[in-house]
């Protein structure tokens, strides 16, 4: 039985008691024992049996009565801890019932009446938590789910009275009450989309999908609190999240900020926090959509995580969300004041991870010079690529463009060797860890490629792209991926014939010397001829 139905049972009991006011002393004193059973016996044996059921699309639509319902659709949910706390009201008096009725079904206000009488039971494989006569007595009880298994949304707290007016005989009381609270399973899931962000500094998208509890919308029930909380890595710019909030399923509806939800961001000690808080109108829309939909009708929150261009993403980037699906007192989260906590409020998701690693590129040559500074000045760009038998084919990480562009990594597109012929590329997403999942089987598409766009003085450019991989095992240990690029001296080290101005001058001088030499020889020959004659 849903909590609203339980409260209706409470209201019905109160109404029946009020209707039987003639049987109750107007002074508020307890009525004498009634042999017909129309007044409450304060010493009667009482029991409360909780049937814990999984919420489906077809159960939870009939109002509970407090009686056992053998026909109830109930797939049991085990390992749910129920805590019942007796309220400080006397149900043997008119005033006690009126105190409850004046709360107008507000369970939170009922919590102010709690006593110190508390009992706990955990459901077994049959989904039952049976509070016996030894654990209960005549009175009103606040019933809470104080522990649930992972991925189970707890039902709302509710108030139940022992006894309740017997609906099958309204002249009598039912001291053995049965209730059927429902749980929605698989409450919250989170996914990361980092495939379009191979280089650090690019946007990463987080999608949080949460189940919506089913309530009796036509009967006036509404979800009383609904918050999606995201624990953000401090490197994410919390002021630039630009959330998109939708109800997805049979009929998709995009919710409007301010009207349907508010975004509250706050700074914590080790993390930042973002809370999507549904407004009253947003909760109404969610309640209506879930009632008219099915189990696939869910709330979806998409957050666009932005970073500073030169952000250090080396290692793991972890993100976890939580869901607060109702107004249970167990959920004490204050979105404006997270304090120093690192715990995820509500029902947590499994953490989603992105893994980025550093690449250290070392430039050398086949001549293996001792002076490594000779390899400085080489420039490289990085692409995603597909390895082929003959080399690699470059790809564009942005399919919306018609050109193949180099990756922007840490705000840079070109990386130049310096120092001892090296350059760091910070940082690249691991090829074997994409969109939050480990890739056990890598393919020829899972590569990056280096393209040399400028060679050092005296060396050839690389003729082909150079494929390499960044692996998660190294990234998570913050161990650099080392890539060595070996250049060949220009023209493979062979000298070419001299050309240009220097060569022409040399030939001119050589020609002049030959001419001068010839003139000297001719003059000498002439002198010898004259001397003979």
Swiss-Prot record:
Topology term for the membrane: Peptidoglycan-anchor
One cellular component term from this protein's GO annotations in UniProt: extracellular region
Gene3D superfamilies documented for this protein: 2.60.40.740, Immunoglobulins (2.60.40.10)
Keywords: Cell wall, Fimbrium, Peptidoglycan-anchor, Secreted, Signal
InterPro entries: Fim_isopep_form_D2_dom, FM1-like, GramPos_pilinD1_N, Ig-like_fold, LPXTG_anchor, SpaA_PFL_dom_1, TAT_signal
UniProt short sequence motif LPXTG sorting signal, positions renumbered to this chain: 496-500
Signal peptide span: 1-30
Pfam entry (one): SpaA
Entry's Gene Ontology BP terms: carbohydrate metabolic process
UniProt modified residues of type Pentaglycyl murein peptidoglycan amidated threonine: 499
Ubl conjugation keyword on record: no
Subcellular location, record wording: Secreted, Cell wall; Fimbrium
Domain of life of the organism encoding this protein: Bacteria
Propeptide stretches in the record: 500-533
Purpose: Major fimbrial subunit of A.viscosus.
Name of this chain's protein: Fimbrial subunit type 1
Organism in which the protein naturally occurs: Actinomyces viscosus
């Amino acid at each position: 039985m849903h909590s609203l139905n339980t409260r209706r049972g409470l209201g019905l009991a109160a109404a029946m008691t009020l209707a039987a006011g003639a049987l109750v002393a107007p002074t508020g004193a307890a009525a004498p024992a009634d042999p017909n059973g129309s007044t409450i016996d304060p010493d009667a044996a009482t029991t409360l049996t909780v049937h814990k059921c999984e919420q489906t699309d077809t159960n939870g639509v009939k109002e509970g009565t407090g009686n056992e319902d053998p026909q109830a659709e109930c797939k049991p949910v085990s390992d749910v801890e129920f805590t019942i706390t007796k309220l400080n009201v006397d149900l043997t008096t008119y005033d006690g019932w009126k105190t409850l009725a004046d709360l107008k079904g507000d369970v939170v206000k009922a919590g102010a009446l709690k006593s110190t009488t508390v009992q706990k039971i955990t459901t077994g494989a049959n989904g039952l938590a049976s509070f016996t006569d030894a654990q209960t007595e005549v009175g009103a009880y606040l019933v809470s789910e104080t522990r649930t298994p992972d991925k189970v949304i707890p039902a709302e707290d509710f108030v139940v009275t022992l006894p309740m007016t017997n609906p099958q005989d309204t002249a009598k009381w039912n001291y053995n009450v049965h209730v059927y609270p429902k749980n929605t399973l698989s409450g919250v899931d989170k996914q990361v989309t980092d495939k379009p962000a191979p280089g650090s500094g690019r946007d990463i998208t987080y999608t949080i999908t949460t189940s919506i509890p089913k309530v009796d919308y036509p009967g006036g029930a509404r979800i009383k609190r609904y918050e999606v909380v995201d624990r953000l890595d401090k490197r994410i710019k919390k002021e630039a999240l630009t959330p998109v909030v939708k109800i997805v399923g049979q009929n998709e509806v995009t919710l409007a900020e301010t009207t349907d939800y508010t975004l509250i961001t706050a700074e914590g000690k080790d993390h930042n926090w973002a809370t999507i808080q549904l407004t009253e109108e947003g909760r109404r829309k969610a309640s209506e959509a879930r009632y008219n939909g099915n189990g696939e009708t869910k709330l979806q929150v998409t957050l666009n995580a932005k970073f500073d261009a030169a952000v250090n993403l080396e290692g793991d980037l972890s993100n976890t969300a939580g869901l607060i699906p109702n107004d249970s007192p167990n959920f004490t989260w204050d979105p404006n004041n997270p304090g120093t906590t690192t715990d995820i409020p509500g029902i947590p998701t499994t953490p989603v991870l992105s893994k980025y690693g550093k690449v250290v590129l070392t430039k050398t040559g086949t001549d293996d010079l001792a002076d490594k500074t000779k390899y400085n000045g080489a420039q490289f760009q990085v692409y995603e690529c597909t390895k082929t038998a003959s080399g690699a084919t470059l790809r564009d990480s942005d399919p919306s463009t018609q050109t193949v562009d180099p990756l922007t990594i840490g705000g840079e597109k070109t990386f130049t060797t310096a120092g001892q012929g090296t350059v760091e590329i910070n940082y690249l997403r691991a090829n074997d860890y994409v969109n939050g999942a480990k890739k056990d089987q890598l393919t020829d598409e899972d590569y990056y490629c280096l393209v040399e766009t400028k060679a050092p003085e005296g060396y050839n450019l690389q003729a082909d792209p150079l494929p390499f991989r960044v692996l998660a095992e190294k990234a998570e240990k913050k161990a650099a991926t080392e890539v060595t690029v070996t250049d060949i001296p220009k023209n493979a080290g062979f000298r070419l014939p001299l050309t240009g101005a220097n060569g022409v001058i040399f030939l001119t001088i050589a020609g002049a010397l030959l001419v001068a030499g010839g003139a000297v020889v001719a003059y000498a020959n002439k002198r010898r001829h004259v001397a003979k004659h």
